[in-house]
Amino acid sequence: MKRILIVDDEPVVIGVLRAFFAEFQHGHTYELTTASSANDAFILLLQEQFDLILLDIVLPVIDYWHVQQAAGLDLLKRVRDLGVTAPVLMMTGGDGGTPREVEALIEGAFGYLHKPFDLSELDHLVTLALGPRAASG
């Protein structure tokens, strides 16, 4: 069983990804965990291990007084600082090649996906990200 963490603040995106993993199993079983904020995801990553992380590039960060928009890049950096080695696929509403996407790759993201998703591209990147490990589970 492959454990996947989906981090996105849009319920529709989480729903699409849940449907995708139910449909495109390739004989594998996936356990999906979701988080709607960088804070929630960080806590999960401290407590659990995942085989793949799908991370929105822009997520809300809640401080004690208001909600700020903070790049998922910050979470990506914190994840790598924790020593988490799971591949991270960044998700973005951008049209490709933006500075944030380039920075995500520099910071160690495995790749990125554009919303709305091309399901064949999503399938291909998930298969590549899970690599040889996907064949065993």
Range-by-range predicted roles:
Residues 43, 62-84:
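Short amphipathic alpha-helix used as the core "switch/output" element in two-component signaling
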Residues 66-70, 74, 95-111:
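Alpha4 helix (beta4-alpha4-beta5 surface) of REC/receiver domains from two-component response regulators
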